[in-house]
Amino acid sequence: MQRIVYLERESVIAEVRRPAFAHQWTEYAKTAPGQVVERLAGATIAIINKVPLPAAAVNALPELKMVAIAATGTNIVDLEACKARGIVVSNIRGYADHTVPEHVMALMLALSRNLIAWRESVQAGRWQQSDQFCLFDHPIRDLHGATLGLIGSGSLGNGVARLAEAFGMRVLRAEHKNSATVRPGYTSF
């Protein structure tokens, strides 16, 4: 029987489906870094979100076979230590593939249009008091024709690139740092 320990249940508000295979499930609302090894003792599967799992912790857990990260990033886990031990590491792929790129574009539009400054001018009554049909207090820039540099070409970076290109932006993707070659469509880091 697999022993599954979820170290940070409060970090995910969605219902978590339990696996169909025989297992013992233990969950904690939150876990501090100093509690990781104690709470994962005897676990075969660890579910984590933000609490780090460094090499020392990985190596102190001989029964551990899998680390499931309830997030997109894997930077909280020592991947080399897991690989050396044959521990499978999985993360949530495809999460917010549309939501995050759309939010990025919304923020770029807000910045390029100076949305906050314009809102404050309207709230202060400047627009209503203007002798002109509009105000020229804050610069407005178009995204069309602008250049966007992206670091990362995973699903989120590619989603942002697609939307930016649809806006008529020039997209530069950064090649991996210290890469010996630069792929077509990329620029050196």
Regions found by a protein language model. Give the residues of each.
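Short beta->alpha connector loops at strand-helix junctions that form conserved
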Residues: 29, 70-71, 87-98, 175
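Rossmann-fold NAD(P) dinucleotide-binding segment
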Residues: 52-64, 81
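Short acidic/histidine-rich motifs immediately flanking catalytic phosphotransfer sites
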Residues: 40-45, 62-64
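Phosphate-binding beta-alpha-beta segment of Rossmann-like dinucleotide-binding domains, i.e.
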Residues: 93-147
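N-terminal glycine-/charge-rich "phosphate-binding" loop or analogous flexible N-terminal tail
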Residues: 1-43, 172
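Rossmann-like dinucleotide/phosphate-binding beta-alpha-beta segment
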Residues: 134-189
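Rossmann-fold NAD(P)-binding glycine/threonine-rich loop
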Residues: 75-85
